[in-house]
Amino acid sequence: MTMTHLNRLILISLLFVSLLLKSSTASSTVVDEGNRTSRNFRYRTHRFVPRFNHHPYHVTPHRSCDSFIRPYARSMCIELQRIHRSSRKQPLLSPPPPEIDPRYGVDKRLVPSGPNPLHN
């Protein structure tokens, strides 16, 4: 092997080891269920951060928007709750039961009325 291939191999192995170390330290920085050592750590969406509370505006079912201290966070919480409430759709009405054609004893087919869309 030439010297450049050896240097490239060493560089790749060092990068791999540093990534492994970084991922292991990121998972160990969580002190307990809510407290974290870094102020910005809770804003990360890293794969080692628990999925249930990885977003700064995540509202748990027992938490109200009044518990947020910052006004922006509180207004964002209220807005997200409003969006969530409006996104819940009413259950769709079931389609009417099919009409049976008395002449043939089969379901009636709906025929569109109005102008022919294929006619120019």
Swiss-Prot record:
Residues 1-26 form the signal peptide. Residues 85-120 are annotated as: Disordered. GO terms for biological process: cell-cell signaling involved in cell fate commitment; maintenance of root meristem identity; phloem development; regulation of cell differentiation. One of its GO terms (cellular component) is apoplast. Keywords: Developmental protein, Differentiation, Glycoprotein, Hydroxylation, Secreted, Signal. The modification Hydroxyproline is found at residues 112, 115. Residues 100-110 have a biased composition (Basic and acidic residues). It comes from the Eukaryota. Disulfide bonds: none annotated. Glycans are attached at residues 35, 115. InterPro entries: CLE9-13 (IPR039618). Belongs to the CLV3/ESR signal peptide family. This is CLAVATA3/ESR (CLE)-related protein 9. It comes from Arabidopsis thaliana (Mouse-ear cress). The lineage of its organism: Eukaryota, Viridiplantae, Streptophyta, Embryophyta, Tracheophyta. The gene is CLE9.
